[in-house]
Amino acid sequence: MYPNSPSLGRIPLPLPCARQQQTSAYLSKVPVSVAPDLLSPEQFFQASLNIHKNANLPRLLMNGNVLTVPPLSSPPWSYLNHSPLISPGSPPSSFQNRKRRSDEGNSPYDVKRQRFQSPQEQTVNHQAVPLRGDIRCSYPGSPAFPLLQSPSPPVLKGHSSNSGDCWLYDHIDTTLPVAKDKLSKQILDLFQALQQQVCDLKKKDICRAELQREIQQIFPQSRLYLVGSSLNGFGIRSSDADLCLVLKEEPMNQNTEARHILSLLHKHFYTRLSYIERPQFIRAKVPIVKFRDKVSGAEFDLNVNNVVGIRNTFLLRTYAYLDKRVRPLVLVIKKWANHHGINDASRGTLSSYTIVLMVLHYLQTLPEPILPSLQKKYPECFDRTMQLHLVHQAPRNIPQFLSKNETPLGDLLLGFLKYFAVEFDWSKDIISLREAKALPRTDDYEWRNKYICVEEPFDGSNTARAVYEKQKFDLIRAEFLKAWVALRDNRDLYSLLPVKGIMKKMHSL
């Protein structure tokens, strides 16, 4: 399926030469059980020069010129090949700004050269032709096109191989509640059309594994995690996939280190990987690189070291399967919010993560709670200092929460809308999943002068900080009130959503 497979006619990779074995021996001395804050680039460069002192080191070029990267103050990550972009032994400028001479031979790795048509049409230089729709290819200097051999990256302690994480497909009880009324049945029918399928998750994880393989040639101690709705049980078939690249388990400055790393990866994706389409570097509070995987068709958002996203993914995943009603209720509410224009943090409304926290909070605060506070009930499973490679294992043995509350899905949806339309005090209260209740606002900066306050369960930040305009806050409250009145009077999901149209679209995916 991937480059160097028999179907592509590539010859097997040669055995490493003596010089490469020396490099591997050097790298093997680096312990892999600790965070990758081991070598600065300067230290690594010096060690590499000692190993390769009689060899011609490859040059790092960007747009035909040697790239000089301004050093950060004691950066905690290290490069394997001195930089993200490694050229073959011959100068890469031989591929640029000239026509091919008639006396140049055709090697097995010759590829057609393409120019970028426009910044909006970001295809890849040196694209091989033709590319089948079900393969992923890389270009000269990338690990799948090894004109310059490099040692294989180490496997981090506690992790599975690059082929994927087998625990993703562990059996989970996904039986659904019995619907005894029309509205509950409509919710279940829509949920079954919306929910992410196992095949959708596998496609995303295959791309994650292939990207991790590429990135580990640049940052050998790194690990790429699939996070967010794709993994927490609340994803729909059309959900974007969130990726978190972890270089160290300590906090990273998102304005300097993370931006610098993402800019390097953006350049690498842009020029080396044929299966990455439209990579965009977004300089937000948590910077990301957005791109599309041509093979799966999935959209991805890649961040660096935003490790709280890994922890809350598995917290929410545990909540998702505690009670059979949780996932259907959350997915239908997310779809309602999206359809009515209040589910877009980039436009000053609610993020999907915030909406999920609001639904879970409501289920915790019922007179007979459907959900507990997992962080209070099982603190050892959700310790925010736990090593990342243990985070997915800790909640595995938590049993289902046996609630005495048997309220049907239709009534829960109506109650959720009523709670935030007329009962919750937006001006005085903080939504807290960690405490399983509404907390009184304090005068802390995080909550001061905010229209909506939703506590992030691990770092205590406000996940609803994007709602900073009164106009958007009024819109959100108005949609809750309008939906509650419509559903109260009609008891029909069609009064909130064009259900048939949504289901038809989902079935076509």
From Swiss-Prot:
Domain PAP-associated stretches: 409-462
GO biological process, one term: RNA 3'-end processing
Entry EC number(s): 2.7.7.19
Statement: the UniProt record of this protein carries the keyword Kinase: no
Enzyme superclass (EC): transferase
Up-regulation conditions: Autoregulated; mediates its own polyadenylation and translational activation during frog oocyte maturation.
A GO cellular-component term linked to this record: cytoplasm
Catalytic activity: RNA(n) + ATP = RNA(n)-3'-adenine ribonucleotide + diphosphate
Amino acid composition bias (Polar residues), ranges on this chain: 116-125
Cofactors required: Mg(2+); Mn(2+)
A Pfam family matched in the record: MTPAP-like_central
Subcellular location: Cytoplasm
Family: Belongs to the DNA polymerase type-B-like family. GLD2 subfamily.
Function field: Cytoplasmic poly(A) RNA polymerase that adds successive AMP monomers to the 3'-end of specific RNAs, forming a poly(A) tail. In contrast to the canonical nuclear poly(A) RNA polymerase, it only adds poly(A) to selected cytoplasmic mRNAs during oocyte maturation. Plays a central role during oocyte maturation by mediating polyadenylation of dormant mRNAs, which contain 5'AAUAAA-3' sequence in their 3'-UTR. In immature oocytes, polyadenylation of poly(A) tails is counteracted by the ribonuclease parn.
Protein name: Poly(A) RNA polymerase GLD2-B
